[in-house]
Amino acid sequence: MRKGKLPRKLGRTASHRRATLANLSSQLIIYKRVTTTEAKAKEMKRIVDKLITRAKKGTVHAQREVFKFVRDKEAVKTLFEDVVSKSAERNGGYTRVIKLPPRYGDAAKMALIELVDYSEMTTEKAVKRQDRSRRVKGSKKAIDEKTSDDSASVEAAPAAPEAEEKKDA
């Protein structure tokens, strides 16, 4: 039976594949979740799990080895300061791949890859966005009510000065 070979080729040359995975890995470390194709996400999972395991050593040599692949100072700093401290008690499986509906346009299989220890942070953001959309809807209603109240007061306002003129006469 035919078996798949790793690493996945991703339809790129070796240098392009390495650069793509390095960029995606650094973005995952910085933003804690990335939406990409399923094949890239699965390949990235292998790489990022190894990077986090290496970073848990905390040595200068480990920093240099991680930087050799990632090539982003901000990502390396975030990895060694935040990600490692949050996933210190975990022995592996630092990332999670969640399958998404196919991409519109070319129907490519899509997936969301995220750091497991940061998943509650991302759900809080979703709740905040939901609240914001409710406020926007509420403010639109408030604006509509306000404009209807203003138009009613404008109609009532000219009647009031006429009444005052009659009282003066």
From Swiss-Prot:
SUPFAM superfamilies the record matches: Prokaryotic ribosomal protein L17 (SSF64263)
Tagged with keyword Oxidoreductase: no
Cellular component GO terms held in the UniProt record: cytosolic large ribosomal subunit
Residues covered by region (Disordered): 124-169
Similarity annotation: Belongs to the bacterial ribosomal protein bL17 family.
A GO molecular-function annotation: structural constituent of ribosome
Protein's recorded name: Large ribosomal subunit protein bL17
GO BP: any one term: translation
Stored InterPro entries: Ribosomal_bL17, Ribosomal_bL17_sf
A Pfam family of this chain: Ribosomal_L17
Residue ranges, compositional bias (Basic residues): 131-140
Keywords: Ribonucleoprotein, Ribosomal protein
Ribosomal protein recorded as keyword: yes
Organism: Chloroherpeton thalassium (strain ATCC 35110 / GB-78)
Quaternary structure, from the entry: Part of the 50S ribosomal subunit. Contacts protein L32.
Skewed-composition ranges (Low complexity): 150-161
